[in-house]
């Protein structure tokens, strides 16, 4: 039977619970931070060997720590390494104290008898290290990220310390998925003793009633991904990397398997829906940008005629070439620059803001001109009535003209003249006119 962990998960206890304690950087240490609301954050991970019910995952970082339990020195009252420290504490008269002092001295040798009586929390310096008492185990190295649960789902709430003075200063972040602990390490933990009164800690356990939530909210948080892992970590195959898909995210289907989603442990209400919506095709014509992989898409892509950021020579966004769509120093810059043919502010010959070649406002909300550019538009485009910018058969986004001849960024000699030929093209099942150089840009369509 379990001896009850500090926290319970949906009414269930586990063999052990690991706490990763952090304090706010505004405070020097945990002892000082514990006196301030939100001064401490504790990441809690349950430990169990019950593979059938919980399917716990191996946590190599925790194993690195737990495997040193066997290195702890088993002491007797006369020979243990903390004997001198304990004698010094006994001479302070702590054992005769009552109330808060008694609760502190039974759990901690660092009781501060000289602290002001007005602040009981100062009397119990639980987080200060005892001096001259044993040697620390050194050269224990691991990646702190590996301490986290293999499945990034957590429950978080505001609470307090689980040891005196139990200050209400902790932000708890409790992992929903437990980690595995071996039977041998459970045995080692059950044999741990208090170094002051030489009592086996496991004899007391944590069989205490849970605190009332006191109208505090408990939030369930699902993180989409962890920070990038080192290449050598991925080679280990420790369970966490195995859950990732090709784009380094966790798929919903990978969170739980049949063994872990036991009906007596999780209700269906705790599951969450698949939120990988395929919305690209649904929003190509409603004013949104889509990410696409084809030639004539209105979103970001790597093709020739895409309406987003392009890898070609004539970019509509920021680029490293001469034909940029925003700020640039090239000849055919689309934004602010020193080039000749700009569609924004500049010193060029054909500005669309200052009576350029047949410029005017269009219903699409951009300013345009005939031969050169009409806002963030291509040759001879008129504006659509929507919020998108587009031309011809291509889709709405920031677009280029017909793969080359009439793209933004082409020289003047390659562009069509103001009196260029008219043509009609079908777009979204209806005819639209595309603006000509001498037409006003406030027509719903435009001629070329």
Swiss-Prot record:
GO terms for molecular function: carbonate dehydratase activity; zinc ion binding. Glycans are attached at residues 139, 198, 314, 385. Component of the acid-insoluble and acid-soluble organic matrix of calcified layers of the shell (at protein level). Residues 422-435 have a biased composition (Basic residues). Zn(2+) binds at residue 19. Its EC number is 4.2.1.1. It is found in: Secreted. GO terms for cellular component: extracellular region. The keyword Ribosomal protein does not apply. Residues 1-222 form the Alpha-carbonic anhydrase domain. Keywords: Glycoprotein, Lyase, Metal-binding, Secreted, Zinc. Pfam families: Carb_anhydrase (PF00194). Residues 281-334, 342-354, 370-379, 386-421, 436-448 have a biased composition (Basic and acidic residues). InterPro entries: CA_dom (IPR001148), CA_dom_sf (IPR036398), Carbonic_anhydrase_a-class (IPR023561). Residues 229-448 are annotated as: Disordered. It is an enzyme of class 4 (lyase). SUPFAM superfamilies: Carbonic anhydrase. Its main location: secreted. Belongs to the alpha-carbonic anhydrase family. Reversible hydration of carbon dioxide. This is Putative carbonic anhydrase 2. It comes from Lottia gigantea.
């Amino acid at each position: 039977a379990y001896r009850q962990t500090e926290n319970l998960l949906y009414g269930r206890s586990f063999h052990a619970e690991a706490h990763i304690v952090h304090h706010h950087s505004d405070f020097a240490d945990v002892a000082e931070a514990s006196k301030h609301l939100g001064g401490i954050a504790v990441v809690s991970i349950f430990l169990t060997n019950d593979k059938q019910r919980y399917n716990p995952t191996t946590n190599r970082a925790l194993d690195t720590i737990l495997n040193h339990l066997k290195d702890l020195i088993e002491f007797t009252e006369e020979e243990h390494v903390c004997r001198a420290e304990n004698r010094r504490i006994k001479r302070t008269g702590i054992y005769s104290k009552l109330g808060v002092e008694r609760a502190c001295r039974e759990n901690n040798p660092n009781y501060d008898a000289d602290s002001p009586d007005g602040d009981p929390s100062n009397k119990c310096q639980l987080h200060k290290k005892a001096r001259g008492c044993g040697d620390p185990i050194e050269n224990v190295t691991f990646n702190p990220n590996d301490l986290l649960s293999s499945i990034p789902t957590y429950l978080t709430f505001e609470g307090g310390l689980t040891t005196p003075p139990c200050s209400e200063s902790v932000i708890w972040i409790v992992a929903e998925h437990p980690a595995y602990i071996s039977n041998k390490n459970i045995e080692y933990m059950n044999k741990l003793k208090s170094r002051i009164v030489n009592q086996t800690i496991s004899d007391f356990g944590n069989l205490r009633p849970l605190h009332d939530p006191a109208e505090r909210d408990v939030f369930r948080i699902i993180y989409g991904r962890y920070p990038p892992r080192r290449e050598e970590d991925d080679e280990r195959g420790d369970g966490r990397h195995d859950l990732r898909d090709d784009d380094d995210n966790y798929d919903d289907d990978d969170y739980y398997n049949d063994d872990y989603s036991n009906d007596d442990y999780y209700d269906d209400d705790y599951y969450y829906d698949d939120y990988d919506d395929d919305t690209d095709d649904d929003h190509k014509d409603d004013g949104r940008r889509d990410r696409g992989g084809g030639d004539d898409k209105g979103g970001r892509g790597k093709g020739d005629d895409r309406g987003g950021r392009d890898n070609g020579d004539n970019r509509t966004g920021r680029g490293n070439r001469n034909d940029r769509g925003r700020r640039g120093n090239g000849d055919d810059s689309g934004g602010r620059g020193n080039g000749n043919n700009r569609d924004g502010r500049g010193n060029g010959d054909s500005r669309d803001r200052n009576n350029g070649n047949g410029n005017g406002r269009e219903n699409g909300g951009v300013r345009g001109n005939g031969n050169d550019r009409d806002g963030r538009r291509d040759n001879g485009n008129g504006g659509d009535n929507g919020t998108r910018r587009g031309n011809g058969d291509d889709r709405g986004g920031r677009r280029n003209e017909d793969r080359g001849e009439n793209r933004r960024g082409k020289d003047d000699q390659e562009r069509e003249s103001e009196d260029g030929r008219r043509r009609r093209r079908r777009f979204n099942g209806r005819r639209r006119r595309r603006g000509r150089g001498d037409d006003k840009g406030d027509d719903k369509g435009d001629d070329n």
